[in-house]
């Protein structure tokens, strides 16, 4: 892969969370239930009890230890600061309470649009996908324009229709990338949408596998070769990636990596960083 694509100067900033410029939207707008990922129940539109008056989290450095693994794994792809600073022009929901409910409805729509942009941006950085870069760029610019619509128009968007269009080009990108892998004889159970909860996949050659939407919860992927593998939408909570090689894998988000376990020997693509909780 290369990082040659610069659709505008702040692309990397725009597509990653900047909590300092957000009104704590993920901590308010989104609901969650008490579980292994969250320490207590919270309704959508209700501020988390850990959200401070400055919109920062009081336990941010200790989220996993305090029972909020779900928060540590969440990624808004920059939607939070876009809604806070651009869509609502810096007017926060506490000082402008009449905007609160609408803002909380706009945020998840923006998050989905920014997620699409993140995937498209990655596709545009892949040299092997150059034959379709023109179409990818056109699609990126179309979705990016949607993110700058008014709050009223954002609420009327048919997000699923736009996601279907984006997915068409992401699928083509995936096919181009995975075709470059030496195709080993993959286990039959390893395929798109596979249920691989707790699966024993240690040390397997899974290069070029299509793991789109696969359930990899607590899967043992230690020392597995996962190069040029498509991870889009895969649930990787508690998957063990210790010693695994994921270089050249595609559509692997920081949220997925944060939800998994690994170690200093895990090789990750350049688009994500090693989580602090990995040993």
Curated annotation (Swiss-Prot):
SUPFAM superfamilies: Pentapeptide repeat-like. It comes from the Bacteria. It holds the Pfam family Pentapeptide. PANTHER family: BTB_POZ DOMAIN-CONTAINING PROTEIN KCTD9 (PTHR14136), PENTAPEPTIDE REPEAT-CONTAINING PROTEIN (PTHR14136:SF37). This is Uncharacterized protein YybG. The gene is yybG.
